[in-house]
């Protein structure tokens, strides 16, 4: 047998350039790139070394023979001419893989059968012994590739694909293959950073593939050191002594690497179900002293190495499979960029994405981009230096716009620099006092309109100190204070949401219409908001699902803040906006009590309470609602704040869901509708009639020491007396109503319920 062999190293598409550098470094000679492969010449020692040390190859194929072929008979005889007795025993096992087509072979299964027949016929003994097929663990795995009329017959030295290192027995929903992860790390400069003693953090680590591959690179561990079964183990050309020598060298290098002070390598994962599988993978790789995995959200990501060293932040954000829609992904990327800018200054970052356009939403420029393929999906690796001069603020402006801004700044003699942001005790930004607005002549109001404007301004003044102190962004400024102006007016940052209550039949419709027009003329002036930002709806008594039906179809969402969280409201499309303002104190209470708890939100609507619970450090949140529309909205709210996988969203009838639920929760919030008769429900829900069954089912899921909060806005609601006989029930309505709803004490009622 020759001292030098032709080798083919296969790899994922896009890794050829990296693989040829690695292979040449390991001893491959006359190396050339091919599509998804590298070809070269090597000794048996180099072939073994490539099997052991290649972080990027899928397979190491040793070419046994090349021969021309025009038809199936040429294929059969070409394989038959090989001295197979030099490669395997007559009673051994084999598997055959065939790729390519042409020369009369248009079916790979047929081609594989012809190769198998030739090998079996060559080795069949007079006694009837012959090789058998074992597709899973054969003694030899033979590969034949048909390329433009030439057959390339090879022995697969690797056996199973080399990306299967043996440590990742548990994986998440959309894992990266280990060799692709290694390639991304190499392209990201991790070998250089590790050699300098730098740190590595993955804010979306899943089951830790990036972490383990990074640890093996840093500790000089051969990626396939722990593999026990190889494609050459039963090959008659195998040289055990040579293999043993190379394997022992790799063991010694790994021992020396692991004896060094471990680098700071940390992973954070939102989904609690992936934490232990990730830790198990790290332990199987022998890197428990180097790598730690914690539960954590992107929204709270902040790497803090022991010695304050900088390093590499690397991650593979979901492409849509895990989060569901593009809007959620947009918020995720925005949060990632925000955390990089705020918590990772002077670090390097590498973001591997199947949605490169979303990478632009991070607000940081990438200085290099590399193309990769994750299976059949084209992807980009964005390399980022987290430095202030790379931050992108605001929208892109033309040179003319920038010049106009400079001229305006010079004219005003005001430095064009951002002011330092200040925050109130609830974590909301305190808005700077705006410059005086230019004086614009306003249309003259009617007597009734002026009276209404005066009332609005009086209410604003009365609430101004409370609004400023609490950092309230959305609040009610008027709620039918004057009977002749029957409407509710809510401020949503710089928008106004007006709900006209349907006038009783005793009121002259013409007079009601005049008053409405007077009010609409007064609102922009009194609240100092452009009339284009005033949204008006009529609120009537709702029945069935009418309260959830679309009023319009603009699909415009506005972002508001409350208690340090960001929420999306839609002021146009539905009667309600996605945020029940009267429940603000309840949401703040939940945020304060949620730390470390399992939170359940029933009839969750847009899951604003779940967002507050996640902000407060809830161990997990589960939100249940019958409406897919509102659950999609809820997903956006969670993603907007960087909360994702550990926050479950369940579509279903709450009563049926509770009957099938077997989990326990420490904190439960129930805010049911007064009435519901959706087609997706088995029956009709009536809060007065069904309250006992609902609360009993929920209390059965309440953990020891847990708290259930029950609230509803049915004005005639009466809590059943027998509930207080079984549970500790305390009405807390007064503490759940803020000053903006103090004029309407019946806006809702709320109770705290615990086990006796």
Curated annotation (Swiss-Prot):
Keyword terms, alphabetized: Cytoplasm, Methyltransferase, RNA-binding, rRNA processing, S-adenosyl-L-methionine, Transferase
Record-linked Pfam families: Methyltrans_SAM, RlmL_1st, THUMP, UPF0020
EC number of the protein: 2.1.1.173, 2.1.1.264
EC class: transferase
Reaction equation(s) it catalyzes: guanosine(2445) in 23S rRNA + S-adenosyl-L-methionine = N(2)-methylguanosine(2445) in 23S rRNA + S-adenosyl-L-homocysteine + H(+); guanosine(2069) in 23S rRNA + S-adenosyl-L-methionine = N(2)-methylguanosine(2069) in 23S rRNA + S-adenosyl-L-homocysteine + H(+)
GO CC, alphabetical: cytoplasm
Disordered, as annotated region: 395-441
Domain (THUMP): residue spans on this chain: 46-157
Keyword Metal-binding: no
This protein's record includes keyword Translocase: no
Subcellular location: Cytoplasm
Role noted for this protein: Specifically methylates the guanine in position 2445 (m2G2445) and the guanine in position 2069 (m7G2069) of 23S rRNA.
Family to which the UniProt record says this protein belongs: Belongs to the methyltransferase superfamily. RlmKL family.
Protein's UniProt name: Ribosomal RNA large subunit methyltransferase K/L
Organism of this sequence: Pseudomonas fluorescens (strain Pf0-1)
């Amino acid at each position: 047998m020759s001292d030098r062999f032709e080798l083919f190293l296969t790899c994922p598409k896009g890794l050829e350039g990296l693989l040829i550098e690695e292979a040449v470094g390991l001893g491959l000679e006359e190396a050339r790139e091919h599509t998804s492969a590298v070809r070269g010449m090597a000794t048996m020692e180099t072939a073994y070394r490539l099997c052991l040390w290649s972080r990027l190859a899928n397979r190491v194929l040793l070419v046994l023979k090349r021969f021309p072929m025009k038809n199936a008979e040429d294929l059969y005889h070409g394989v038959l001419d090989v001295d197979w007795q030099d490669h395997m025993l007559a009673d051994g096992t084999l598997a055959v893989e065939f790729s390519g087509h042409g020369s009369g072979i248009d079916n790979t299964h047929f081609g594989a059968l012809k190769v198998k027949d030739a090998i079996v016929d060559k080795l069949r003994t007079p006694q009837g012994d012959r090789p058998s097929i074992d597709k899973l663990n054969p003694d030899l795995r033979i590969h034949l590739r048909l390329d433009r009329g030439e057959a390339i017959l090879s022995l697969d030295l690797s056996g199973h694909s080399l990306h299967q290192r043996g440590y990742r027995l548990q994986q998440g929903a959309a894992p990266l293959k280990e060799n692709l992860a290694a390639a991304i790390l190499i392209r990201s400069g991790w070998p250089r950073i590790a050699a300098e003693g730098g740190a590595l953090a993955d804010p979306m680590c899943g089951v830790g593939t990036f972490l383990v591959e990074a640890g093996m690179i840093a500790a000089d561990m051969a990626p396939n050191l722990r593999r026990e079964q190889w494609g050459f183990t039963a090959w008659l050309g195998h040289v055990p002594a040579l293999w043993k020598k190379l394997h022992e060298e790799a063991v010694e290098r790994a021992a020396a690497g692991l004896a060094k002070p471990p680098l700071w390598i940390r992973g954070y994962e939102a989904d609690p179900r992936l934490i232990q599988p990730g830790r198990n993978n790290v332990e199987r790789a022998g890197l428990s002293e180097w790598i730690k995995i914690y539960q954590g959200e992107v929204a709270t990501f902040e790497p803090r190495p022991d010695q304050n060293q900088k390093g590499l932040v690397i991650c593979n954000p979901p492409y849509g499979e895990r989060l569901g829609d593009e809007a959620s992904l947009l918020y995720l990327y925005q949060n990632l960029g925000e955390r990089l800018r705020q918590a990772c200054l002077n670090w390097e970052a590498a973001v591997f994405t199947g949605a490169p356009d979303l990478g632009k939403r991070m607000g940081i420029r990438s200085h290099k981009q590399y193309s990769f393929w994750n299976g059949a999906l084209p992807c980009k690796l964005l390399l980022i230096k987290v430095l202030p001069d790379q931050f992108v603020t605001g929208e892109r402006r033309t040179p003319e716009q920038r010049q106009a801004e400079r001229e305006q700044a010079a004219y005003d003699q005001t430095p064009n620099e951002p002011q330092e942001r200040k925050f109130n005790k609830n974590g909301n930004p305190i808005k700077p006092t705006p410059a005086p607005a230019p004086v614009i002549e306003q249309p003259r109001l009617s007597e009734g309109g002026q009276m209404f404007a005066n009332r609005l301004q009086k209410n604003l003044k009365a609430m101004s100190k409370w609004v400023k102190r609490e950092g309230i962004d959305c609040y009610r400024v008027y709620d039918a204070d004057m009977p002749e102006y029957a409407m509710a007016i809510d401020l949503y940052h710089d928008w106004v949401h007006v709900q006209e209550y349907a006038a009783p039949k005793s009121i002259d419709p013409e007079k009601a219409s005049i008053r409405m027009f007077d009010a609409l003329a007064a609102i922009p002036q009194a609240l100092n908001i452009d009339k284009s930002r005033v949204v008006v709806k009529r609120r009537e008594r709702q029945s069935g699902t009418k309260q959830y039906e679309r009023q319009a179809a603009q699909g415009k969402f506005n972002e508001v803040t409350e208690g340090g969280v960001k929420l999306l409201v839609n002021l146009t499309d539905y009667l309600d906006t996605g945020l029940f303002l009267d429940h603000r104190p309840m949401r703040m209470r939940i945020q304060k009590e949620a730390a470390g708890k399992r939170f359940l939100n029933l009839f969750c609507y847009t899951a604003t309470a779940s967002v507050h619970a996640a902000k407060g450090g809830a161990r997990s949140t589960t939100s249940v609602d019958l409406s897919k529309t509102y659950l999609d909205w809820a997903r956006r709210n969670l993603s907007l704040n960087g909360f994702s996988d550990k926050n479950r969203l369940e579509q279903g009838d709450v009563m049926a869901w509770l009957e099938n639920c077997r989990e326990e929760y420490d904190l439960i919030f129930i805010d049911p509708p007064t009435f519901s008769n959706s087609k997706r429900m088995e029956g009709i829900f009536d809060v007065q009639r069904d309250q006992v069954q609902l609360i009993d089912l929920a209390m059965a899921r309440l953990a020891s020491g847990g708290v259930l909060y029950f609230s509803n806005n049915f004005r005639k609601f009466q809590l059943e007396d027998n509930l207080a006989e079984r549970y500790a029930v305390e009405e807390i309505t007064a503490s759940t109503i803020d000053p903006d709803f103090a004029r309407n004490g019946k806006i809702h009622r709320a109770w705290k319920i615990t086990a006796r």
